[in-house]
Amino acid sequence: MEKLIDDEYKVTIIGNLIRDERKAQKKSASVIASLSGISQQFLSELERGKKSLPYSTVHSVFNVLNIHFDPDIELIRRADDLINNIINAYMNFDRDSMLSSLELLICNSYRYSYAYDYYQTAILLKDIFIKKVDKPVFIRHFKNPKLEMLNLICLEKTDSKNTMFYITQGLSYHSSTHTQPSYCGLYCILLFDLAEYHEKNNDLLKALSAYKEVIQAASANYFRRFSLSAELAYAITYSKLGDISLSQEYLERIISIAQPDDDIEKQIIYAAVINSATNFLIMGDYNKCQATAISLFNENISETNHNFVCYQLAFSNYMLGNTDKALNYCRHYKLSDNDRSFPADFIRMLISLKSDTPNEQMLIDLFSTALLNGDSSDVEVSFKLLTDVLKKNKDFAKAVEYYDKYIQYRFSKRI
């Protein structure tokens, strides 16, 4: 028993190390490896003594492995085998051990849900509910609204035909619990999904109402990540409804955050900057659009966001008459192997910049996108630009190839 207490102390120390590493935004692989060695000693004690670990020790192990607010799925899975070993060991012992194993199984399902792996969460929950049904002694112990709520979310995520049923059931059954911090995250997830459902059905006012509820619930319980995400969605929805000034008010509130807590909050702020620049573009304030978008041009952002920024900078410069700058930002637009297409406005802008002829690959992408979009004037002009460059480069084989595509397009339009 002294050995177990000693190991429990080590686990607490390691838990603090992991939390420190997370604050520094480092991977905790080495610390997980250290914990693994200690936990193997726990398992050996279990096998030798045929008895469960002290309840406090169980929670020390779990609290270290539990990666609630770290969406690093790789790290979660590395810890997974260890938790499953503990669960399997418990199942061979007395009732208290089985209760502990089920509790770890429940906690494991929460870990997966926080990493948005709802399929894996659903599998774990199914296992939990089967065990609960088979062993009536567990029913009272695990009559847990939070667990039921998580189950409804998983059903909603994996059964697209009955989405609204599960959302409504979850919100109505647990609407009185959202003021408690332990329920707030799940309550907000259901509200986000409700808003998304209304948006898909073009009911933007109902979507706004759902986002507003998220903001209120998350703010009351200091769930800043949820409240920021909801404020961003709220602002974007107002922009879709045409209320740009109110949209900007919410976006500027997000952008003003000086020190985001983590990388996810940073990405939310980046998204707010991009949407703010888009609003200025819609209003025709090209100087403000340019000044807003340029702040992200050299940031480490996703390819999709990078392309948004390039488009905003190119278009605002184009509208201000800075054609050289516009073309330069066009060339920074990244086309992936799977998607070599430009937005329609981008095509027209590039076409109008024909005096500063873009490179051959850009013109090929431009013509290909025009064919996909089917706008005849875009096709005609982009085809002429492309063939002029191919002839100039004496690349007659490629010129014939694209001439053939052009003829096929013209023939299909006649039909």
Regions found by a protein language model. Name each.
Residues 26-45:
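Short alpha-helical DNA-recognition segment
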Residues 102-109, 139-142, 169-179, 212-223, ...:
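Amphipathic alpha-helical segments of tetratricopeptide repeats
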